[in-house]
């Protein structure tokens, strides 16, 4: 029977397994076994923003008060009633935190299949696409865990940095990034440093300071306690932390020297959410990645965009292998424990939780 970790939508620290009957496939449907997936702070953000951004709508739970958290990873077709999707086909994509997923297979293009189920029709299309491993430009043998843990985060990093480059970094001479030890921040810093538009400044906790400095993708690294010691040069700010207190202090410190303020994530999802947005400097703007992706698809074409992302991804993957290790959790009990470890911030930034064999 399929097994899912269902989470209280209003208390992410409450999560238990449910088992559901196996439904017979209808014509055109495909059943995937979820083989291996990652758990990162990004998944916790999906839960925090689940109602506002409709993340809970991808894989509805039977109980509307609970949700099935989306995760990224690899799955294998174990049953198919679609003649173009054979049993044994492997794909990378967006799964529920569970043992399997049944999709309504459609829009096959030789490289991927899309879940065209009615409940996903109005949700962002990139999340509905399952890319066959043999045709996946992001896939490399020996880099599966890197892809599981970093690919969706890196795509966000690419869009963040590309958006800034598309606007000439808003005339900033330096780039300040909060939650600098987070994987999305590291990707953005790696790309910004390669762009060479000026110093890349990372802000992190004291406990992650040594790790973040050791990465080499930041020119300057400081702690949250030392924000006010940063040079007040013309700067743009990438808010990965989602901590309103940090944003307030960045804005008040840089004042009119802050040329742009971008909100990306919520790695500090449980901190100071009730504080008001700053009234000093530019109004923070939320990055809606699909808009920039659509713009670049128009500018470069789909193949041109994928080529640029792919080239950057290969470089970043080689870089990530130097500092990222996998903490593999096997079986239901270990996976649930891994979820709580990520939720409560007990995973070192140099480690990624990879889950397998949830049956």
Predicted regions span which residues?
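A short N-terminal beta-strand-loop micro-motif at the entrance of redox/enzyme domains
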Residues: 9-36, 41
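NAD(P)H dinucleotide-binding glycine-rich loop of Rossmann-like/cofactor-binding domains
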Residues: 94-174
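N-terminal Rossmann-fold NAD(P) dinucleotide-binding loop
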Residues: 185-186
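Adenosine-nucleotide cofactor-binding segment
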Residues: 193-247
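Short acidic-hydrophobic, aromatic-tinged amphipathic segments that line or gate anion-handling sites
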Residues: 219-227, 288-289, 326-331
